[in-house]
Regions:
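Conserved short alpha-helical segments that host acidic/polar catalytic motifs at enzyme active sites
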Residues: 1-264
């Protein structure tokens, strides 16, 4: 059980990128403490990735999102496949030009790597989530069809250095919330994360859950495309509690409040 979050900001948005990133990280901190990380698209179009083997609190003060970086991905990990001792297994995951985050389990990743003859991005990688971003890279323009090949559970998002949009998708069995502001679109595994953005950034978001079997493209804080894909509901996994790291949640909330007061 992991946590994902992120945003797309329009050019007229007054949201401070780092403050929003910290709020989102805090809002998903409870969902895993094996690793934490974030990625953003630079104004030049490159996606920079930062991750470490820790819970959210240790990352909170280190997050720096530069002005002009209007797209963000955030992740906390409660690992299943792919040990966190190998940094490449932790999120955000890069496969070629695609960088993404995922909450869930993909059961047929090895089979799909073999069918398509795709090599792992780095030696020793075993994380199942990588197949999402490998398929995304070879299936540009056919995202829904690519997602239909995945067998498992999924809430995911990615940035592609070859395309301008942020892609957000929800498959089977994992929560994913969208928050729409005047010039912003924010997503997260928890409603709490969106509420923290509202509180610390000072914007109002219209909150709703993304339906299962839905993929959206977001650019400049606006939804620019939406598609549906078939979800294979025959997959079943053992349910896990959503709160995997309660101590991280508490300490992250306390530290976020302290940082906010210090910056005021």
């Amino acid at each position: 059980m992991c946590g994902i979050a992120g945003y797309s900001l329009g050019p007229e948005s007054a949201v401070e990128p780092t403050v929003a990133a910290r709020a989102l990280l805090t809002g998903i901190a409870e969902r895993g403490a094996d690793a934490a990380g974030y990625a953003y698209r630079t104004p030049a179009g490159r996606v920079d990735v930062h991750k470490q083997r820790s819970g959210a609190t240790a990352l909170l003060e280190r997050i720096r999102v530069p002005e002009g970086a209007s797209q963000l991905l955030v992740h906390v990990r409660d690992h299943t496949k792919g040990h966190p001792s190998l940094a490449a297994n932790n999120h955000p995951i890069r496969h070629g030009a695609v960088v993404g985050v995922h909450n869930g389990v993909i059961d047929n990743d090895d089979a799909l790597f073999a069918v398509y003859g795709i090599d792992r991005a780095e030696p020793g990688m075993t994380v199942d989530s990588e197949i999402i971003f490998a398929l995304a890279e070879i299936s540009r323009g056919r995202t829904g069809a690519a997602l239909e090949q995945l067998y498992g559970t999924m809430a995911t998002a990615w940035l592609d250095e070859g395309r301008p949009e942020l892609i957000v998708a929800r498959g089977l069995g994992r929560p994913l919330w969208l928050g729409r502001g005047k010039h912003e679109l924010v997503f997260a595994s928890t409603r709490l994360a969106l509420e923290l953005v509202e509180s610390y950034v000072g914007i109002k978001l219209r909150k709703s859950e993304l339906p299962e079997g839905t993929v959206v493209a977001v650019e400049n804080g606006k939804l620019v495309a939406k598609d549906s894909f078939q979800v294979d509901r025959s997959f079943h996994d053992d349910p896990l509690p959503a709160v995997r790291a309660p101590d991280e949640a508490r300490s992250c909330r306390e530290r976020l409040a302290t940082l906010h007061v210090a910056a005021a």
